[in-house]
Amino acid sequence: MMFRLTSVSCFLLVIACLNLFQVVLTSRCFPPGIYCTPYLPCCWGICCGTCRNVCHLRFGKRATFQE
């Protein structure tokens, strides 16, 4: 009886540890300068392809055309 109780408690402990590791690994974030997506967020700042403090707008040829 003692063996069964110990093995069940060890099994439950392993499940709890795996859930804890899953939460830690899925909630990580990336520092500035690292590639990011909406599913891989920045720790701080904004995701503009890479983690940055401010997104700079990039204009095409039509926007820079001068008469």
From Swiss-Prot:
Keywords recorded for this protein, A-Z: Amidation, Cleavage on pair of basic residues, Disulfide bond, Ion channel impairing toxin, Neurotoxin, Potassium channel impairing toxin, Secreted, Signal, Toxin, Voltage-gated potassium channel impairing toxin
Matching Pfam families: Conotoxin_I2 (PF17557)
Residue numbers covered by the propeptide annotation in the UniProt entry: 63-67
A GO molecular function held by the record: toxin activity
Phenylalanine amide PTM sites in chain numbering: F59
Tissue: Expressed by the venom duct.
Cysteine-cysteine disulfides: C29-C43, C36-C48, C42-C51, C47-C55
Stretch forming the signal peptide: 1-26
Major localisation: secreted
Domain of life according to the entry: Eukaryota
Localization in the cell: Secreted
InterPro entries reported for this sequence: Conotoxin-I_CS, Conotoxin_I2
Family annotation (PROSITE patterns): I_CONOTOXIN
Function according to Swiss-Prot or TrEMBL: Inhibits the vertebrate voltage-gated potassium channels Kv1.1/KCNA1 and Kv1.3/KCNA3.
Family classification: Belongs to the conotoxin I2 superfamily.
Record comment regarding domains: The cysteine framework is XI (C-C-CC-CC-C-C).
The protein, known as: Kappa-conotoxin-like Em11.8
Species name: Conus emaciatus (False virgin cone)
